[in-house]
Amino acid sequence: MSQAVEFQILTATGWEDYALLDSGNGLRLEQYGRYRLIRPAAQAMWRPALREEEWQSADAVFQPSGGESGGQWQVRKSSLPDVWQMGYRHLRFQVSIGTSRHVGVFVEQSAQWDWISETVQSASQPLQVLNLFAYTGIATLAASYAGAKVTHVDASKK
């Protein structure tokens, strides 16, 4: 006889600088701070809910060229800077469009950043954190801001 396993589903809440505006036809329309971006989303096989005008207002569109990371950004509006700031709760960080579909923040990870902050703050003694494969470093920011001493390691050349 098998036993039931309990688990908690973490959801990404608390964003003011990010919103998933719409998705469909293999794409997603997202708001990153003041800027709207269109990125591929192969799982979004339905029709978009918003009108075409909303999609046309995007500042940039990522055009994939095959493979997971191949492609380039088509900038539609010259007002889109190379780098801009965003925030999540008390954390501030920079994002940018570059040579991949990613912008330097994985918004779905915000539930983990909250967990990290809460765990560090509620610890009975100061914590030391080793963040391997740290990539953009927002988990490092969360741990450090909460009071941990953090070693940040990533092999990315960015």
Name every feature range the model reports, one short phrase each:
Residues S2-L20:
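Short, Gly/Pro- and small/polar-rich lid/capping loops
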Residues E118-K158:
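Conserved SAM/SAH cofactor-binding pocket of Class I
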